[in-house]
Regions:
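Alpha-helix capping/termination and helix-coil
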Residues: 161, 165-172, 183-191, 195-202, ...
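Short, surface-exposed loop/turn motifs that are enriched in glycine and acidic residues
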Residues: 173, 177-181, 189, 217, ...
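Short, motif-level signal for alpha-helix interfacial/capping segments enriched in acidic residues
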Residues: 28-37, 174-177, 203-219
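Transmembrane alpha-helical segments that form the membrane-embedded catalytic/substrate-channel core
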Residues: 41-56, 85-89, 180-206
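Active-site/pore-lining binding-face segments in mid-to-C-terminal subdomains
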Residues: 196-267
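Histidine-centered catalytic micro-motifs
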Residues: 50-59, 89-101, 193-200, 223-239
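Non-catalytic, topology-defining segments of multipass membrane proteins
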Residues: 1-61, 66-68, 72, 76-175, ...
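Hydrophobic alpha-helical segments, principally membrane-spanning helices and signal/leader peptides
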Residues: 28, 40, 70-71, 182, ...
Length: 328
């Protein structure tokens, strides 16, 4: 994980000095170019990579429990500069999403939406932007987990309180340094989750092989710590990021038997974009035919179209599955 440590130092060296300069009373001919460079590097250069590093370290913290305070550096110190409010990511992703597996109790579930619909994606994104924290808190109340509820509320509240206070000194700098990264991060996280869980087998939505997708052979995986291997990540959330390609190669028949969708030469943004265009020919051309599981391109297109249809609520949750297993 040393590459992640080096990456952290690079972010500190780039963004902390630039943020300080943006809060200084620089002349406009210096401030505006600096703001543009900061925003470009943040949004297009490093934000996604930071979020996915935060993802890795949320699952596998760098430091042992006795040094846990050092694990707070990424979410509490560096995170706000990269669009992440403290504790919210961990609470949502570790404390909710992986436990609920995109089923009905998952606050970010894609099940009930038509996943090639621009209107449905807009509803999904806006709902998360404006009500995500409230629904997450309600989820933790329902599950009687006050610690994570309180952490997420405190982290998000302190982020906005800090932004308000800093706005009194320089609202333009606060907008560039904290608010724009925050908004764009929330949007891209929802875009990513939408793509990762777009093709759900309605007959078995609790099956990780049938509710998530994997993308391979794209530079996204080299830049973003193999985040494209989303199926294996749900099957084994604690699997080290370097081991995901091996998991796929060693379990090709399992993927084929479960009808798992693996795409190559495209990343999640491309999946989302082509879904919004309803370009199933393009999407199907990127699907990997593992062990000859498909007979034709037309069969792949038919499967893709079937698996983006909305799934009506029937009370399918991880709790209901566990209860059914106990009865059985």
């Amino acid at each position: 994980d040393l590459v992640l440590v080096y990456f952290t130092f690079r972010l500190i060296a780039i963004f902390i000095p630039m943020a300080i300069l943006l809060y200084l009373a620089l002349p406009l001919y210096l401030w505006i170019p600096l703001a543009i460079v900061y925003s470009y590097l943040n949004v297009f250069g490093y934000k996604s990579r930071f979020t996915l590093m935060l993802h890795i370290t949320s699952h596998r913290p760098w430091f042992k429990s006795e040094y846990n305070y050092l694990n707070k550096f990424l979410p509490w110190i560096l995170g706000p500069f990269m669009g992440q409010s403290p504790e919210a990511y961990f609470a949502h992703h570790i404390g909710m999403h992986h436990l609920e597996g995109n089923l009905e109790d998952d606050d970010s579930t894609t099940m009930h939406y038509k996943r090639d619909s621009k209107a449905d994606f807009s509803k999904y994104m806006l709902s998360f932007l404006f009500f995500g924290l409230f629904r997450l808190a309600a989820y933790f109340n329902k599950k009687n987990r006050p610690e994570l509820r309180n952490k997420s509320i405190i982290g998000e509240s302190l982020f906005f309180i800090g932004a308000i206070v800093l706005s009194y000194f320089n609202w333009q700098a606060t907008l560039v340094v904290f608010i724009l990264p925050f908004i764009t991060t929330r949007i891209t996280m929802m875009l990513g989750n939408w793509a990762q869980h777009s093709f759900i087998d309605a007959s078995d939505p609790a099956n990780e092989y049938k509710s998530a997708i994997t993308v391979i052979n794209h530079r996204f995986n080299q830049r973003c710590w193999n985040d494209g291997y989303h199926i294996s990540h749900h099957v084994k959330p604690s699997l080290h990021w370097t081991n995901h390609p091996a998991h796929l190669l060693e379990n090709k028949q399992v993927y084929a038997d479960n009808g798992a969708l693996v795409f190559e030469g495209i990343e999640f943004g491309g999946i989302w974009y082509n879904l919004m265009k309803k370009d199933y020919d393009k999407l199907a051309s990127h699907v990997v035919n593992i062990n000859g599981m498909y007979n034709s391109l037309e069969e792949i297109i038919a499967i893709l179209k079937e698996r983006i249809k909305p799934i009506a609520p029937v009370g399918l949750t991880m709790d209901s599955i566990r209860a059914a297993k106990k009865v059985a």
